[in-house]
């Protein structure tokens, strides 16, 4: 599979998983409902007008603009990846793809609904969704790829 295909398939699968999971939650749980009602792990239907940890709550226009910038940055990084060897690998473009997926997933919600649907609650950590998970895991993955390639003096492994 080419790097371009890895990037776009990663992004498409991430957006699909995010939007499908949010559709299932919205169709089956009213906002504020939790399953189970208490416990360390819950599925909770929450409307979040902010960003991570509900920062910038109520500033949807700014968050839409920031998300559009995020999409542009992810696409730019993909198209300029040859300048950063750790990005020009299948793992590098897959990580960029899931970052793009997370950005687009929440952007779709903000434009369509004016809020993001969050539903995963673990302990006292703020409620989040699949798009948030894509963003977080993609960024961690890119950092690890960068650290691995920088410390080894070469490119990140093509098959990592």
Swiss-Prot record:
Please cite one Gene Ontology biological process associated with this protein: proteolysis
Q: What pathway annotation does it carry?
A: Protein modification; lipoprotein biosynthesis (signal peptide cleavage)
Predominant location = membrane
The places in or outside the cell where this protein is found are: Cell membrane
Q: Where is the active site?
A: 118, 132
Enumerate the Pfam families for this protein: Peptidase_A8 (PF01252)
**Assigned protein family:** Belongs to the peptidase A8 family.
Stated name of the protein: Lipoprotein signal peptidase
**Source organism of this protein record:** Dehalococcoides mccartyi (strain ATCC BAA-2266 / KCTC 15142 / 195)
